[in-house]
Amino acid sequence: MTGIKDVLYVRFCVTDLQAQQKFLDDFGFQTRIDDGLLMARGTDGSPYIYLAEEASEPAFVSVGFAAESEAALRDIAAIDGTPIETNPLSGGGLIARLTDPNGFSVEVVADIADSSLLTVAGRSGFNDGVEKQRLGERVAFAAP
């Protein structure tokens, strides 16, 4: 049986969506808020790696995994008889929403269209505990 190929995103509830967006922007993510959902992406082709919606209490909502294929998604969804739906987020594809044994939401998606890669300028300065040399710049590290 095929299965999961990667962790795709995490989803949270936050008490202040704009403050969270600023934090992520300063951290170097590319962000946007669309219909009350904060979406953040890195420099790779994934249309989002972090999702957040506003709520009265901060909370972990779910983790999203990328299935190896639509067939793998269907196999995984069949384990619990979970319906497969059209993914309403950027990149489209299909999604199955499951619940793990501890009650946490797990989303498994397939066939999400990649976004274009984001270019990263030369080496950026590093932030430390005293001085912030890099605000709002994305940083990518080359693999060794």
Task: Show which residues each predicted segment covers.
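Conserved short beta-strand elements that form part of the metal-binding/catalytic scaffold
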Residues: 29-61, 105-112
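Vicinal oxygen chelate
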Residues: 15-18, 35-36, 64-144
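N-terminal beta-strand motif that seeds the catalytic metal site of vicinal oxygen chelate
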Residues: 1-18, 60-63, 121-144
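Core segments of cupin and vicinal oxygen chelate
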Residues: 2-48
